[in-house]
Amino acid sequence: MIEVFLFGIVLGLIPITLTGLFVTAYLQYRRGDQLDL
């Protein structure tokens, strides 16, 4: 039962982590793009 609970937590955290990394990379890319201009 605990294993299923941990598995659910991991499955819930993975998309959040990927989204956070994507947003951070996108904001850094936008900032670098503006600096070039």
From Swiss-Prot:
Source organism of this protein record: Phalaenopsis aphrodite subsp. formosana (Moth orchid)
Keyword field contains Transmembrane helix: yes
Record's subcellular location: Plastid, Chloroplast thylakoid membrane
Listed name of the protein: Cytochrome b6-f complex subunit 5
Function: Component of the cytochrome b6-f complex, which mediates electron transfer between photosystem II (PSII) and photosystem I (PSI), cyclic electron flow around PSI, and state transitions. PetG is required for either the stability or assembly of the cytochrome b6-f complex.
Main location: plastid
One GO term of the biological process aspect: photosynthesis
GO CC, alphabetical: chloroplast thylakoid membrane; cytochrome b6f complex
Listed GO MF terms: electron transporter, transferring electrons within cytochrome b6/f complex of photosystem II activity
Domain of life per record: Eukaryota
Similarity remark: Belongs to the PetG family.
